[in-house]
């Protein structure tokens, strides 16, 4: 009986997702109440999916058409892998999980990932964001206003670490949030990452104070 109920819940969930009209179609602009996103394709991540052994799904890139800078397409920024983010008192994963709380079950069942591409200015403020998701019903059912709220909260609460070490006006960073494991496991892992983020935040604050102190002596 229990197995029958679980199967019924699964098919109802899948049916609900498949019955919804997809928000994101290649080459089109999808409109929300607060903003609109242009939808394009990035073929790079198809290879990554094959390597990871997950079902091959086309990647969907969402870019806010109301961005003030339009730097992603013009490539007027310094791209360097491994740029650290200041994620305290709130982490990027915490922001994403909170806004996608209602969709967590479907995202976890499908073992999906979201890539968040960011541009920061010389002060470390995040000024432009684009999302990379998979062409999967669980993502397709999420309205653009949800991504907009994630984008706005990231801009308010996340900063780039040590932006002064770059010569360019804008610096690129990327992070990914995965939905691998149970919801409980994801939240427990996020708490551990938050503690590490706190330690790094304190380290970065102390390093900045020491540098300012050295510069004041010159």
Each model region followed by its residue ranges:
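Charge-biased low-complexity segments
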Residues: 20-218
């Amino acid at each position: 009986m229990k197995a029958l109920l679980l199967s019924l819940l699964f098919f109802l969930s899948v049916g609900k997702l498949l019955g919804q009209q997809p928000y994101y179609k290649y080459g089109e602009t999808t409109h929300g109440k607060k903003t609109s996103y242009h939808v394009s394709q990035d073929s790079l991540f198809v290879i990554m999916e094959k390597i990871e052994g997950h079902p091959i799904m086309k990647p969907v890139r969402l870019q806010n058409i109301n961005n003030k800078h339009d730097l992603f397409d013009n490539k007027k920024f310094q791209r360097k892998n491994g740029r650290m983010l200041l994620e305290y008192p709130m982490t990027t994963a915490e922001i994403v999980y909170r806004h996608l709380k209602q969709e967590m079950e479907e995202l976890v069942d499908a073992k999906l990932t979201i890539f968040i591409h960011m541009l920061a200015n010389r002060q470390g403020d995040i000024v432009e964001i684009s999302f990379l998701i998979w062409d999967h019903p669980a993502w397709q059912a999420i309205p653009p206003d949800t991504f907009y709220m994630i984008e706005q909260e990231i801009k308010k609460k996340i900063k780039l670490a040590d932006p002064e070490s770059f010569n360019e006006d804008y610096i690129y960073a990327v992070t990914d949030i995965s939905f691998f494991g149970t919801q409980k496991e994801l939240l427990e892992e996020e708490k551990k990452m938050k503690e590490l983020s706190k330690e790094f935040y304190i380290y970065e604050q102390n390093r900045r104070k020491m540098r300012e102190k050295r510069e004041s002596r010159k």
